[in-house]
Amino acid sequence: VREMGGLHKFSGWSGPILTDSGGFQVFSLASLRKIKEEGVYFQSHVDGRHIFMGPEESMRIQSNLGSTIAMAFDECVENPAKYEYAKKSCERTVRWLERCKAEMQRLNSLPGTVNPHQLLFGINQGCTFDELRIENMKQISALDLDGYAIGGLAVGEPKEDMYRIISAVEPYAPADKIRYLMLSLIHISEPTR
């Protein structure tokens, strides 16, 4: 895709394109992954290969795709989760975000970058714990990114919790930046018979 000029040229689409970091995809491979400070080690469900993905790798992949918006690499925690694990995950996600920002700035400054104006969005996490969610949004907002997403929703929690979290966190998202609500429609749609 990089050799073809990035996603915009490859697809013939001149509008905005957002690429995900791989965090949700890693979440979906729960039985095949190991999360560490440096990133995530997982096993391919296709051929059994061992693969590593960290913040820098995620940013390099998204930079090569040349999307308009790149999402920061984060850990999406399945609900319900224990408070202590959710807290540690939030802290790690902020550290990963700092690494994403540094790598994105480096990549955007390189000659030959597909999209040197690529935007970076941070992702709010904290499971169903309002205080973790609010603190996490304050921490990621302090990094002065291009936009902010509320992520880690519709991953097992009741809809009432999802709506409560959105209401609790939204006031802490910077009003002068783009806001993005990330939802897995697979988990919130009602089954039809």
Enumerate the language-model features and the residues they cover.
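Charged helix-capping and loop-helix junction motifs
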Residues: 3, 137, 162-167
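Active-site-proximal segments of catalytic enzyme domains
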Residues: 155-158, 162, 168-171
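Non-catalytic, usually N-terminal nucleic-acid engagement modules in DNA/RNA processing proteins
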Residues: 1-114
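Alpha-helix N-cap and loop-to-helix initiation/capping positions
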Residues: 50, 81-92, 128-135, 157-161, ...
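Residue-level detector of conserved catalytic or cofactor/ligand-binding positions
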Residues: 186-193
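Hydrophobic faces of well-ordered beta-strands that scaffold small-molecule active sites
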Residues: 17-20, 70-72, 120-124, 148-150, ...
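Active-site-proximal loop/turn and secondary-structure-junction residues that shape catalytic pockets
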Residues: 23-25, 75-78, 126-128, 154, ...
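Alpha/beta enzyme core
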Residues: 64-68, 92-120, 125-155, 172
